From Swiss-Prot:
Name the record gives this protein: UDP-N-acetylglucosamine transporter
Function: Transports diphosphate-N-acetylglucosamine (UDP-GlcNAc) from the cytosol into the lumen of the Golgi apparatus, functioning as an antiporter that exchanges UDP-N-acetyl-alpha-D-glucosamine for UMP. May supply UDP-GlcNAc as substrate for Golgi-resident glycosyltransferases that generate highly branched, multiantennary complex N-glycans and keratan sulfate. However, the exact role of SLC35A3 still needs to be elucidated, it could be a member of a catalytically more efficient multiprotein complex rather than function independently as a single transporter.
Topology versus the membrane: Multi-pass membrane protein
One GO cellular component, as annotated: Golgi membrane
Catalytic reaction(s) noted: UMP(out) + UDP-N-acetyl-alpha-D-glucosamine(in) = UMP(in) + UDP-N-acetyl-alpha-D-glucosamine(out)
Modifications after synthesis and translation: O-Glcnacylation regulates the stability of SLC35A3 and the specific complex formation with MGAT4B.
Chain's gene name: SLC35A3
Length: 325
């Protein structure tokens, strides 16, 4: 049963990661009449959906009792304001990160984005060393060097990109800066969140509700500051269609899927899922979206990144001493 849950959770992770990247890219580049949906509002809606999903999970853990659910939410959130406030910092950073991903996929093809975004492994590792005093082994440090080399190859401009007039250097640079900033914020927020989880006994679902609460507030502030005029003119849900809602739901489920993978799987299998997602994104970008032509340099970089992903999660087991009779 446990093995089935492990592979089911990994399968869902591959589907969620690949689908989110591709549908988000498609929704941001699709030419359509009327105003395009605002990414800032999509981030807010995704946070609200995540809160609802986590409340349902807490309700399930409370043996489907509304009274027990109300008591848990009251005791763990309202009666512990300082614990709740701890989530304000990572929540604000996650909100920024989610907005940056829309910017990145508006300017980069899905395959390049997927591979470059794996730099979050590097930032997470560095923040883990500095904030959690985590010790990295030889394989981990080697994987980080391979990772940086692979991403550099992926970002290496090809002749077709240099000659292309459709995709300006400016938009490529904006996309790259958005991904790099998202990697940095993902690493810091992820380690900060892990530190909080290890220091307290609150469930991951309660913590996600707290994250979603602050995320909604920060997200609404972003809507007001950057898109307030457009919202007042065309409405909060302007440009929303079936594809937009698919993107929003997939983004809302992301954190929950990761939580399930952490619970049922390990780093090596998670690395396999990430690698498979990169391969699928590359194939679909080439054959379906037709906005990406892979080069030999890209393939070399992608192979290095996939290798680094596996190597970072590799945990060599020391040879056990044979037991004496």
């Amino acid at each position: 049963m446990f093995a089935n849950l492990k592979y089911v959770s990994l399968g869902i992770l591959v589907f969620q990661t690949t689908s989110l990247v591709l549908t988000m890219r498609y929704s941001r580049t699709l030419k359509e009449e009327g105003p395009r949906y605002l990414s800032s509002t999509a981030v807010v809606v995704a946070e609200l959906l995540k809160i609802m999903a986590c409340i349902l999970l807490v309700y399930k853990d409370s043996k489907c009792s509304l009274r027990a659910l109300n008591r848990v939410l009251h005791d763990e959130i309202l009666n512990k304001p300082m614990e709740t406030l701890k989530l304000a910092i990572p929540s604000g950073i996650y909100t920024l990160q989610n907005n940056l991903l829309y910017v990145a996929l508006s300017n980069l093809d899905a395959a390049t984005y997927q591979v470059t975004y794996q730099l979050k492994i590097l930032t997470t590792a560095l923040f883990s060393v500095s904030m959690l005093s985590k010790k990295l082994g030889v394989y981990q440090w080697l994987s980080l060097v391979i990772l940086m080399t692979g991403v550099a190859f992926v970002q290496w401009p090809s002749d077709s990109q240099l000659d292309s007039k459709e995709l300006s250097a400016g938009s490529q640079f904006v996309g790259l800066m958005a991904v790099l900033t998202a990697c940095f914020s993902s690493g810091f927020a992820g380690v900060y969140f892990e530190k909080i989880l290890k220091e307290t006994k609150q469930s991951v679902w309660i913590r996600n509700i707290q994250l979603g609460f602050f995320g909604s507030i920060f997200g609404l502030m972003g809507v007001y500051i950057y898109d307030g005029e457009l919202v007042s003119k065309n409405g909060f849900f302007q440009g929303y269609n079936r594809l937009t809602w698919i993107v929003v739901v997939l983004q809302a489920l992301g954190g929950l899927v990761i939580a399930a993978v952490i619970k049922y799987a390990d780093n090596i299998l998670k690395g396999f899922a990430t690698s498979l997602s990169i391969i699928l994104s590359t194939l679909i970008s080439y054959f379906w979206l037709q906005d990406f032509v892979p080069t030999s340099v890209f393939f070399l970089g992608a192979i290095l990144v996939i290798t680094a992903t596996f190597l970072y999660g590799y945990d060599p087991k020391p040879a056990g001493n044979p037991t004496k009779a």
